[in-house]
Amino acid sequence: MSNEFINFEKISRESWKTLHQKAKALLTQEELKSITSLNDNISINDVIDIYLPLINLIQVYKIAQENLSFSKSLFLKKDIQLRPFIIGISGSVAVGKSTTSRLLQLLLSRTHPNSQVELVTTDGFLYPNQFLIEQGLLNRKGFPESYNMELLLDFLDSIKNGQTAFAPVYSHDIYDIIPNQKQSFNNPDFLIVEGINVFQNQQNNRLYMSDYFDFSIYIDADSSHIETWYIERFLSILKLAKCDPHNYYAQYAQLPRSEAIAFARNVWKTVNLENLEKFIEPTRNRAELILHKSADHKIDEIYLKK
């Protein structure tokens, strides 16, 4: 961490866990296992030490958002309109964004039982493979230019204004957008937006996705550790794909282990590492909170914007 983080308060794990009174984890070990991504590693103690204080912090921001909205309505002499509380979660491929997002969705649902808590991933806003092929962009999939940012910004604008919104659905099994399938959102109380690009906007330098966020999180780790996690995840995906000939990764499932590792390492270095270093990591200081992971996936440091 460098002067890039001069505007952040660094908090150790030991200090962070004292910011919430000891309580039950609000979920069972089985539930935690069901929402944990392939090759990610999270324990009930992590939930208690890291995520319960985080839920408290989100509540602080939510109260502040509601108070500001109320005050603005009075100032403008308009009816009070409660808007969805939008949380953006970013970080590299294979760093654990999906686990964090699903866990926050579950914990927010438990702590706000009368609230609607929804989750959307920006994968659904990738252009379909056919379009990427036609534009010569298939090998740039995941880079900023491969996303339909106009559609994504329109989606967020509809959500923020309390309108029903629809998001395309992406399947990792077929490595493409599912045709004619949409996920609908009807004015949720909380919306979690997860993706590698949630702090980026390639097409409109005057408007960022983060302009719509009420709270934002960046999952951080040393790139060498993320590379290891990426390769481990790739091998796990290949094991699952062996049983499904329709799975996109089935074409790689018969590779000898050494060749599969070499293939994954090459993809990491030529695609994911470049994307991380050029487009993802430079946006992390736009987050309100940075959760830093050590080699064993455990969050060891927290950075909160001052």
Swiss-Prot record:
Principal cellular location given in the protein's record: cytoplasm
Name the UniProt record assigns to this protein: Pantothenate kinase
Organism taxonomic ancestry: Bacteria, Bacillati, Bacillota, Bacilli, Lactobacillales
GO molecular function: ATP binding; pantothenate kinase activity
UniProt subcellular location: Cytoplasm
HAMAP family to which the protein is assigned, alphabetical: Pantothen_kinase_1
GO biological process entries: coenzyme A biosynthetic process
Keywords linked to the UniProt accession: ATP-binding, Coenzyme A biosynthesis, Cytoplasm, Kinase, Nucleotide-binding, Transferase
Pathway: Cofactor biosynthesis; coenzyme A biosynthesis; CoA from (R)-pantothenate: step 1/5
Transmembrane residue ranges: none
Binding site residues for ATP: 91-98
